[in-house]
Amino acid sequence: MARKGLVERWKKPKKFKTREYTRCKICGRAHSVYREFGICRVCFRKMANEGKLPGVRKATW
Protein backbone atom coordinates (compact mmCIF):
# COMPACT_ATOMS: atom_id res chain seq x y z
CA MET A 1 0.00 0.00 0.00
CA ALA A 2 2.81 2.41 0.81
CA ARG A 3 4.53 1.73 -2.52
CA LYS A 4 1.29 2.38 -4.41
CA GLY A 5 1.02 5.79 -2.76
CA LEU A 6 4.62 6.61 -3.68
CA VAL A 7 4.02 5.64 -7.30
CA GLU A 8 0.91 7.83 -7.46
CA ARG A 9 2.82 10.75 -5.96
CA TRP A 10 5.68 10.17 -8.42
CA LYS A 11 3.34 10.48 -11.42
CA LYS A 12 2.20 13.98 -10.47
CA PRO A 13 4.16 16.83 -12.11
CA LYS A 14 6.86 18.32 -9.89
CA LYS A 15 7.15 21.98 -9.02
CA PHE A 16 10.88 21.95 -9.79
CA LYS A 17 12.56 19.83 -12.46
CA THR A 18 15.45 18.86 -10.15
CA ARG A 19 13.03 16.99 -7.89
CA GLU A 20 12.16 14.49 -10.61
CA TYR A 21 13.79 11.07 -10.43
CA THR A 22 13.65 7.89 -12.45
CA ARG A 23 11.42 4.99 -11.49
CA CYS A 24 10.98 1.59 -13.06
CA LYS A 25 8.05 1.55 -15.50
CA ILE A 26 7.12 -1.98 -14.45
CA CYS A 27 7.49 -2.24 -10.67
CA GLY A 28 8.03 1.37 -9.57
CA ARG A 29 11.45 0.78 -8.01
CA ALA A 30 13.42 4.02 -7.55
CA HIS A 31 16.98 2.69 -7.33
CA SER A 32 19.14 1.15 -10.05
CA VAL A 33 17.02 2.21 -13.04
CA TYR A 34 18.61 1.98 -16.50
CA ARG A 35 17.75 5.13 -18.45
CA GLU A 36 18.01 3.47 -21.85
CA PHE A 37 15.29 0.95 -21.01
CA GLY A 38 13.44 2.78 -18.24
CA ILE A 39 13.37 -0.32 -16.04
CA CYS A 40 15.24 -1.42 -12.91
CA ARG A 41 17.99 -4.02 -12.82
CA VAL A 42 15.67 -6.66 -11.35
CA CYS A 43 13.07 -6.32 -14.11
CA PHE A 44 15.83 -5.96 -16.72
CA ARG A 45 17.41 -9.26 -15.72
CA LYS A 46 14.07 -11.06 -15.61
CA MET A 47 12.97 -9.76 -19.01
CA ALA A 48 16.39 -10.40 -20.59
CA ASN A 49 16.36 -14.02 -19.42
CA GLU A 50 12.85 -14.46 -20.83
CA GLY A 51 13.98 -12.99 -24.17
CA LYS A 52 11.61 -10.02 -24.04
CA LEU A 53 14.31 -7.39 -24.65
CA PRO A 54 15.44 -7.45 -28.29
CA GLY A 55 19.19 -7.26 -28.82
CA VAL A 56 20.12 -8.13 -25.22
CA ARG A 57 22.28 -11.21 -24.69
CA LYS A 58 24.14 -12.72 -21.78
CA ALA A 59 27.83 -11.98 -21.91
CA THR A 60 30.19 -14.90 -22.45
CA TRP A 61 33.98 -14.76 -22.55
Swiss-Prot record:
Name of a matching Pfam family: Ribosomal_S14
Tell me the keywords, alphabetical order.
Metal-binding, Ribonucleoprotein, Ribosomal protein, RNA-binding, rRNA-binding, Zinc
The record's annotation in InterPro entries points to: Ribosomal_uS14, Ribosomal_uS14_bact, Ribosomal_uS14_CS, Ribosomal_uS14_sf
Q: Where does Zn(2+) bind?
A: C24, C27, C40, C43
What family does the entry list?
A: Belongs to the universal ribosomal protein uS14 family. Zinc-binding uS14 subfamily.
Oligomer and partners: Part of the 30S ribosomal subunit. Contacts proteins S3 and S10.
Fetch the NCBIfam families from UniProt. PRK08061.1 (NF005974)
**UniProt name for this protein:** Small ribosomal subunit protein uS14
Q: What is the lineage of its organism?
A: Bacteria, Thermotogati, Thermotogota, Thermotogae, Thermotogales
